[in-house]
Amino acid sequence: MISRRYIEEWKANTSWPNDAQVEQDLVIERALVELFSDNLIRKSLAFRGGTALHKIFMKPQARYSEDIDLVQITAEPINPVLKQIREKLKFLGTKRSVKQNGNNNTIVYRFESEIPPIINLRLKIEINCREHFNVLGLKEIPFAVENSWFSGSCNIISYELEELLGTKLRALYQRRKGRDLFDLYWAITNHNLDIEKIIHCYKEYMNFVVKQPPTSKMFLANMEGKIYDPEFTGDIYSLLRPGVKYENDIAYDLIKTNLLEKI
């Protein structure tokens, strides 16, 4: 889809070890500019999740992230937004699937990598259509991409860093992915953060999904049950930027002390 020379050019902006990752990374960057350059999309959706953390707050990216997670800002019909997303992402071709339900809409584009070995790539866009709220307020964040294949800029609608990390803390409890632990660890060790705000946001988002939010003791028990699980610990290492040193045990001790024991 993207000529080899543009992928080679983009390598100067990334440290990913294989060409397919470099190509997919460039696709993500263009998709973000295309989406948030559109007035309807920018009014309707906010950028959240791991890709938001690493693309707009924690540059250079410490780990690879391949999905775009969005949240519908207000409760309104989503179909006009889906139609506009399709229009803005025409450059990805026609191999597109859409799954809709009351809480989420998932769009997946599929394409083949340009540089051999040819592999199947995808861009998944997931829209949360249930959490029409924020805790610390939305913000506009300047974002730009420069490449001979595509150059452009926009203002991405997203959240305060502490709010993104509050939702990440919720994800750490809810699923078995070591990348959630890594993201929290990397943010705390590389940014001056308001821990109380992170915990406050976590509680607000957890209160939204469960009647009885887990206590600190319950969260710690949850983590003890998976911190040595190969599924959890093995999730992150293939995603790390070359040269990034990381140990799950060290990360857990830091997150346990700074966050979990303060819930």
Predicted features along the sequence, with ranges:
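Glycine-rich beta-strand-to-loop/alpha-helix junction loops that act as flexible
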Residues: 47-52
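Structured mid-to-C-terminal alpha-helical surface segments
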Residues: 1-45, 56-63, 68, 72-263
